[in-house]
Amino acid sequence: MKLIASVLNPVHNFDARSTAMLSLLTFKNCFLSNGRVLIFQLKPCRKLQTTRFVLAESVASNNDILFNATASMRKNKDAAKLMTDRIHYVSPAKRKQTRTPSTGHQNRKRTTLKWNTGSERAQAAANFTLRQVFKMNERGVVKVVNQTTNKLEETSILIWAGELDLQKHGLAIVDVEQRGTFSIPLVKLVESKTALKKYSDELAKQKEEELTRLGFSSKRTGRKNENDSNEDNLKQIKVSWQISDADLNKQKANEIISQLKKGYKVFLYMNGKDALNKSNWAEDITDEEPAHTRKHSDRELERRQHIVEQLQVIVNEFSLSPTVEGSIETRLIMKLSPKPVASKKEDRMALKEQRKRERQEKLERKLEKKKLRNSENY
């Protein structure tokens, strides 16, 4: 590096290149002498180059402006960084306040036990009873019989049932005492089989109530009411008014007779084909007949009467006198009860011959009626 001193005339023309070169100078010192400005510069060059005239005051002012601007920018940058750090930093005390609020599961009381004895079904039955208790009162308070003193005492169901052996015993609520707004159930130990049976009945009852709430009737759920038959040996068979003679005398006759032979009661539901194919066909059969019904031709009514008479002939040998409800104009129910079985072989043979004769006589009467109708038409 060479130290070069250049004396510049204050009245001097400079081009753009000289002005650009001036910006590369590093000013170390300057002073006034006879109205002229002396500028010392450090420049890595071998010869003197023309430099534009610059006042010392302007250079110093520019340097101050650049220095102040740089300092201000650095200060603003540090302040922005500090604010960012403050935003992202959360004190431990505030972290506790910003945690997700509790959903209540941590404070939910236990309403079941983890059993070590008994089958899964027995454990489910016991926990079902526990949930019933907690529905009556939140604390799970029950009345039980003290095995030592044989006296009633109040305790917690979880404590009392904790040591229960489900292979031998189960829980059952036998009574409920009302106290203000809550109830205290009386719980007793029962045999494991009894507890399982009670549990199954409760589940069936809940399922039935759910189906009823969804709009399903007792007929569709299989529930028996006061108007239904109290016996379980009842079979329901549908017979369409449009059935052919071949199907009636073969497939349908075999289906009816086989059930009567087994000792079942049989209800024959006769209605139109479309009505019997509905999902609620049993309700349509038992509901009251509508006031306005479609009229059928005489030929259609004769066909329906023929089906009823033919069914009576088919079941005569195996059924007692059938009970008929309804009308051939709309729908009809034929209720059949099986005949008692003869105890001796001779009685069975005689009964069979008698039924055969009765069937033959009915068939002859039917043919006579048919001939009579044909003669009247001619």
Swiss-Prot record:
Xref: InterPro entries: AIM23
UniProt KW keywords: Mitochondrion, Transit peptide
Compositional bias annotation for Basic and acidic residues: 343-367
Subcellular location, record wording: Mitochondrion
Disulfide bonds: none
A family per Pfam: mIF3
Region (Disordered): 339-378
Predominant subcellular localization, coarse grouping: mitochondrion
Transit peptide per record: 1-18
Entry's Gene Ontology cellular component terms: mitochondrion
Family the entry assigns: Belongs to the AIM23 family.
Protein name: Altered inheritance of mitochondria protein 23, mitochondrial
Organism: Lachancea thermotolerans (strain ATCC 56472 / CBS 6340 / NRRL Y-8284) (Yeast)
Lineage: Eukaryota, Fungi, Dikarya, Ascomycota, Saccharomycotina
